Amino acid sequence: MASVTITSVHEPTNPLAVAHTGEREVEGDQLIKTDTNNDNDIINTLLNNFLYPQELKHNVFVPRFQQRITIVKAWDILSLSTSPPNGTNGANGTNSAPHRPKDLHILDIGCGQGESAVTMAALLQPHMHGARLHITGIDTARPDYGTPYTVAETHAHLTASALGRHISFRREDAAAFFSPSRLSSPSPPGSWPSAANVDAVTLCHSLWYFPTPQSVADLFTTLAGARVPRVYLAEYSFRGSLPGGQQDAHILAARAQALLHASVLEKLSADSSQQNHQGREPRPRAPNVRAALDVGSIVEAAAAAGWAVRRQGTFVPAADMIEGHLEARLVVKDAFAEAVRAEGLSPEREHEVLGLVPGVKKAFARLAAAGVAKGRAMDVWWAELER
């Protein structure tokens, strides 16, 4: 089970919020250590609704969905639907009549193949009690992107599944989704859900894939302009809390990939014939990690657009989450060095990127010497933002 640390000035209020196992006061905020409940039934539901290769079920998709369950529970999005209206609990402490949940429209930005969207549908819908739930996933990836199943194939499978009535997908970015024409147009009866009635935006392991720090800053500005009430984030933190450097390989490999991406963009920006490089599709050799802002940079970009952290926390991914290990293995392969050299970077930049590779190899060597076969994924940071 994943241990979750939450720093918050607001108590979770819904049945999906992770269960408390102990707490202490820290500088006026509340630090709550929590453990996930048994989520096997939810995972089975997700697997029954998702399109994936059976041979990757236990090694990839079970831990991937478990991580998203942990994130969605920590986010506590359901409180937006189930919290009673202001003033229903009087000063004398008496409770009002049971509050009927309100409709909930969530925009999942950078939804990929839909893992986070379907996880929210499976977790939230049983608690809506007659209110409507819809998750709109948006992504700019090509429909034929992905293997062995493409984005188009997984989206079609999801929308035709038992949870599909709560999910839809669009190929566009946040600026297009929240275009002035959509926001300014009157919402006729029956238009729910629409861009004008988004209750929350989620970014689940998607900010790292934005091309530049400026594109992340622009996103927060767009969300502020659209008057989105809440934004929920989850991203790797570039930090590891496990002893013995178990997460070092993932951290260093991610830095190497991010530096490669930044170096390529720097080179392209200097080439007048490539002025529109930021809008193009990723290169076939492009690393999975792109801008990869750290936590402080994400919070700073959000704050510049008027967003403040309402709640935040961290957790260590489960031991069977191998995606960090796979990212690190990619960097130590000869193919990564060959790809770096093929980019035609300046000698200084090439040396800087490749100079991070020995550190990843040393991290693996230390683990091997300790009898550890695989590196662990770095800590995940999540947050709830408000304006």
Curated annotation (Swiss-Prot):
InterPro entries: SAM-dependent_MTases_sf. Keywords: Methyltransferase, S-adenosyl-L-methionine, Transferase. The keyword Hydrolase does not apply. Disruption phenotype: Does not produce N-methylated compounds phomopsin A and N,N-dimethyl phomopsin A, but accumulates N-desmethyl phomopsin A. GO terms for molecular function: methyltransferase activity. Its EC number is 2.1.1.-. GO terms for biological process: methylation. It comes from the Eukaryota. Pathway: Mycotoxin biosynthesis. Residues 98-223 are annotated as: Methyltransferase domain. Belongs to the class I-like SAM-binding methyltransferase superfamily. Erg6/SMT family. Methyltransferase; part of the gene cluster that mediates the biosynthesis of the phomopsins, a group of hexapeptide mycotoxins which infects lupins and causes lupinosis disease in livestock. Within the pathway, phomM acts as an S-adenosylmethionine-dependent alpha-N-methyltransferase that catalyzes two successive N-methylation reactions, converting N-desmethyl-phomopsin A to phomopsin A and phomopsin A further to an N,N-dimethylated congener called phomopsin E. This is Methyltransferase phomM.
